């Protein structure tokens, strides 16, 4: 096995230098770092993590003790737990137990301690009846070897607990049985010695006992479930089965469909959260991935920040209604939707089939390009065939009163939907002159995406320091952005691993203007200045345009024409940074992507990101406004919004950002949710009530950007010209 001494000899450096490089200390030249890393790779060096732990005296290791890794709820918990530890430099030791054999849990705890785990998250099978308990000492107090957090199953000897309200889950499922007027049901639970199972059972029975329903209770566990279920079905077939555990529900379904199938057997079960619709069961859902995420957070907060762990009950997700807001009295005539050609349009095409299945109403979706969309909206008239319109967020001010019906006049109850959305996606976009015209469908923001592996590489970090005497960090200004882009452009740095430092997206005039405005708003909050005047030829505007033109040197001459191109270019792995709207970012993770696992993301420099994306409204000329609004409410709310996001779209619903299956896959969405509140960039002061024609504005501005980019005009001349045109075209502001 290769040693530090072997590496030092091969690299021609001291052992101290090797140690500094391997421990990522920043006091070694880039040349020596490269020699050490090359030598370590050639020798197949593997760090001795055990020795490192002994030197430190502690590890950054947490143990997760699970009953099994077959059940979906435990898989979801672990994935949520791991996502948090990965982002906080902790490792996870996963251990499995046999709930019928306490010795397996004792062994798991002993192993965790032998590995010097600093914390343990455990679904314990121990209670007060056990003669020996690995978590408490002879006085009955919790041992202080490490932080221990009990998951889902409460214990009398510790309040270090996080879980769900299983008693409430039991009550809600019992209400379903009463609502369906069942007279004979099976209630299947795990061992009632576990607090969650006991709480569920008592919650269920406290409600069902008020009815005339006969309940046959079957108590089982993971090892006897098949036998117990088959024995019950041999004696009788109930009208429905109610279960405390999704794993049990799958067994009931498989056994019934294989051996006893006659009529459909309704199965109601407590279940992990499902992002996509699933029809096998009626599910009362619990967000186990969030449970895992918060469990890891609580442990790490206790260990690193001395924040005491308190007993926590998370809110149950409950019955999630995939057909909420749907008008089941809808006609069979198609609903017609006009939308921009984006990833969201394709996810809507797929999910609208659920709407059609429920109502019988076909949904026809027409997709058009950016410029075609404006023309189509501008030419709408009484003969228009469209019922629902997807309008770009920056066009709402101009189009809302011209072509949309106020939603609150169609159905005032729509105002209650606003509570489910991220607040900063509503005002000032959906509401015009006191009326609600649209609901947020795919609100997005421009974010900075970067190659995390390049920014964290010790060789490039040292090289950057040697060149600029500054640390290589995610840029917070566009001057820093260009400096880093230059560093990662092969033309200016031959050993750069990528050809270009950045992308530019400059297709149409509207797209080109976005690159300029992102830079302008890094320096000023809104389009108007402190005097409420719009000066497109100001010194700040000139700086923004020149900064953009400098980026030209660090980007491909074959610039991106649309945001899907930008996502694809970044995914190809030949660029260090890209600015991209989050509703297009899912394509970064396409099947051919070369950057999966190495995608970093941050707010755009200046921390005043531009908002983008689309909102849905009812056409002024629709003959079916109530049906159209019903569809919009269904499409924009939970759980459809989360399903759309999983398919590559984005959501305005707050609950989507608690779905860690989505957030783990598209982690930049969490940043986007928090960044909406930082979006300003308003075109006119609040006192101005004149509609602002965004399309015309970005057309003027984008032409100037393209003229300067192509060398036709100098920046100040182009800006003076666009200012003159702006004053002429927008003189009524």
Over which residues does each language-model region extend?
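Hinge/lid segment of periplasmic solute-binding proteins
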Residues: 393-447, 598-602
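Extracytoplasmic/periplasmic substrate-recognition and gating elements
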Residues: 305, 553, 591-658, 683-687, ...
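N-terminal helix-turn-helix DNA-binding module of bacterial transcription factors
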Residues: 1-58
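Extracytoplasmic/periplasmic solute-binding protein
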Residues: 435-441, 446, 476-533, 575
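N-terminal helix-turn-helix/winged-helix DNA-binding helices
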Residues: 1-2, 41-79, 88, 114, ...
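Glycine-centered hinge/linker elements that transmit conformational signals in sensory
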Residues: 482-487, 519, 523-561, 589
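C-terminal capping/gating helix-and-loop segments adjacent to ligand/active sites or protein-protein/ligand interfaces
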Residues: 367, 671-726, 730
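Alpha-helical recognition/docking segments in bacterial nutrient-uptake
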Residues: 64, 68-175, 229-240, 247-250, ...
């Amino acid at each position: 096995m290769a040693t530090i001494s072997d590496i030092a000899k091969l690299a021609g450096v001291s052992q101290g230098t090797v140690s500094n490089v391997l421990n990522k200390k920043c006091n070694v030249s880039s040349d020596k770092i490269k020699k050490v890393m090359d030598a370590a790779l050639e020798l197949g060096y593997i760090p001795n993590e055990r020795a490192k732990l002994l030197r430190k005296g502690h590890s950054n290791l947490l143990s997760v003790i699970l009953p099994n890794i077959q059940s979906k709820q435990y898989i979801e918990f672990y994935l949520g737990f791991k996502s948090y530890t990965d982002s906080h430099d902790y490792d996870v030791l996963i251990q499995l137990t046999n709930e019928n054999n306490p010795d397996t849990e004792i062994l798991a705890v002993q192993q965790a301690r032998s590995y010097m785990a600093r914390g343990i998250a455990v679904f314990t099978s121990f209670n007060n009846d056990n003669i020996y308990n690995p978590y408490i000492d002879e006085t009955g107090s919790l041992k202080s070897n490490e932080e221990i957090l009990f998951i889902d199953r409460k214990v009398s000897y510790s309040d270090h607990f996080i879980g769900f309200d299983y008693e409430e889950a039991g009550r809600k499922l019992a209400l379903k049985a009463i609502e369906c007027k069942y007279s004979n049901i099976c209630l299947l639970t795990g061992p009632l010695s576990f607090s969650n199972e006991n709480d569920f059972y008592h919650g269920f029975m406290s409600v069902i006992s008020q009815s005339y329903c006969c309940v046959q209770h079957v108590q089982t566990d993971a090892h006897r479930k098949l036998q117990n279920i088959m024995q019950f079905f041999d004696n009788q077939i109930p009208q429905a089965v109610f279960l405390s555990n999704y794993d049990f529900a799958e067994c009931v379904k498989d056994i019934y469909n294989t051996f006893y199938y006659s009529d459909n057997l309704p199965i109601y079960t407590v279940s992990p959260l499902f992002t996509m619709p699933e029809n096998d069961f009626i599910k009362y859902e619990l967000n186990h991935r969030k449970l895992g995420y918060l469990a890891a957070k609580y442990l790490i907060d206790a260990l690193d920040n001395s924040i005491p762990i308190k007993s926590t009950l998370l809110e149950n997700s409950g019955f999630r209604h995939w057909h909420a807001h749907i008008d089941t009295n809808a006609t069979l005539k198609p609903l017609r939707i006009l939308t921009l050609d984006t990833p969201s349009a394709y996810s809507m095409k797929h999910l609208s089939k659920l709407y059609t299945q429920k109502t019988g109403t076909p949904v026809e979706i027409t997709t058009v390009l950016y410029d075609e969309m404006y023309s189509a909206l501008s030419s709408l008239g009484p003969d228009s065939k469209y019922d629902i319109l997807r309008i770009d967020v920056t066009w709402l001010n101009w189009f809302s009163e011209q072509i949309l019906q106020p939603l609150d006049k169609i159905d005032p109850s729509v105002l209650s939907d606003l509570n489910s959305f991220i607040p900063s996606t509503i005002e000032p976009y959906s509401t015009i002159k006191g009326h609600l015209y649209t609901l947020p469908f795919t609100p997005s923001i421009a974010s900075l995406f970067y190659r995390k592996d390049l920014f964290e590489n010790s060789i490039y970090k040292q090289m950057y320091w040697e060149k600029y005497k500054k640390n290589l960090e995610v840029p917070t200004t566009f001057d820093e952005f260009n400096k880093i882009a230059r560093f990662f452009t092969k033309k200016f740095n031959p050993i750069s691993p990528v050809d270009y430092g950045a992308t530019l997206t400059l297709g149409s005039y509207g797209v080109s203007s976005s690159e300029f405005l992102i830079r302008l708003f890094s320096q000023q909050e809104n389009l108007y200045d402190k005097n409420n005047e719009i000066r497109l030829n100001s010194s700040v505007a000139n700086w923004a345009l020149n900064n953009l033109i400098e980026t030209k040197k660090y980007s491909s001459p074959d610039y991106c024409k649309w945001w899907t191109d930008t996502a694809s270019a970044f995914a190809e792995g030949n660029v260090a940074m890209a600015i991209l709207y989050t509703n297009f970012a899912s394509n970064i993770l396409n099947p051919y992507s070369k950057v999966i696992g190495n995608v970093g993301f941050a707010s755009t420099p200046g921390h005043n990101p531009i908002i983008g994306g689309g909102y849905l409204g009812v056409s002024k000329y629709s003959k079916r406004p109530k049906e159209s609004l019903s569809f919009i409410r269904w499409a924009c709310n939970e759980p459809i919004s989360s399903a759309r996001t999983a398919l590559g779209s984005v959501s305005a619903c707050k609950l989507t950002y608690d779905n860690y299956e989505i957030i783990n896959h598209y982690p930049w969405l969490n940043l986007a949710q928090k960044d909406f509140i930082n979006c300003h960039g308003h075109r006119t002061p609040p006192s101005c009530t004149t509609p602002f024609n965004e399309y015309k504005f970005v057309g003027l501005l984008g032409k100037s950007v393209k003229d300067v980019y192509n060398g036709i005009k100098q920046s100040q001349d182009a800006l003076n010209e666009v200012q003159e045109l702006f004053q002429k075209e927008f003189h009524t502001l």
